[in-house]
């Protein structure tokens, strides 16, 4: 794990970070309907495919890897890994599992499946223990679709990493759409960066999981 400290005095975002981190602490969220038609047509498992795609784009851009590490240093990680929730039907609780990222989907899927076998039934907040500091949170609410979603974190204004929440997919105009809520910190991520992320995520979904009819 590599963490590169940021020199705030020479950082191009110094003024913006100071404003949205210290003067007017600000996080924001938005929901985007992603076209997952081809992914569903292929019969791929939705959760690991989305975890892979999201993490791939997170690892492309520094603004989604910028954080304050346990030592209190501002900087960015070279690579991130997803930490995601799994639901326990028997007692209606959930646990968090983290999976090591791999650039190739089949390799990531193998890591995911191994973690599910080992930790999928483990109870408690952390089903898989000892998550590394270079993880980011992902969750899914598969029982409901939504067009708005927001996390209210009372002490979360020093949390700089993105938070992703997926909802229930639905049909519209012949397409299968998946709502994805993304919460980011304005000190490191502007609207431009968020929209670029979504555009690249949508493109990757079509590229990595092309329609079998093509």
Regions found by a protein language model. Give the residues of each.
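Short, charge-patterned binding micro-sites
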Residues: 76-90
């Amino acid at each position: 794990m590599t963490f590169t400290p940021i020199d705030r005095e020479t950082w191009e975002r110094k003024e913006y970070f100071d404003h949205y981190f210290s003067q007017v602490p600000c996080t924001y969220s938005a929901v985007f309907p992603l076209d997952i038609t081809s992914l569903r047509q292929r019969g791929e498992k939705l959760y690991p495919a989305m975890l892979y795609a999201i993490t791939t784009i997170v690892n492309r851009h520094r603004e989604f890897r910028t954080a304050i590490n346990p030592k209190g240093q501002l900087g960015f990680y070279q690579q991130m890994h997803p930490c995601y929730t799994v639901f326990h039907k028997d007692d209606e609780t959930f646990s968090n599992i983290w999976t090591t990222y791999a650039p190739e989907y089949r390799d990531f899927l193998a890591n995911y499946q191994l973690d599910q076998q080992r930790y999928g039934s483990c109870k408690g907040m952390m089903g898989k223990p000892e998550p590394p500091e270079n993880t980011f949170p992902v969750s899914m609410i598969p029982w409901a679709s939504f067009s708005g979603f927001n996390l209210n974190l009372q002490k979360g204004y020093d949390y700089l990493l993105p938070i992703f929440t997926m909802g229930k997919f639905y049909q519209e105009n012949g397409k299968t759409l998946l709502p994805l809520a993304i919460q980011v910190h304005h000190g490191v991520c502007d609207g431009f960066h968020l929209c670029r992320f979504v555009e690249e995520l949508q493109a990757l979904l079509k590229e990595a999981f092309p329609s079998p009819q093509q």
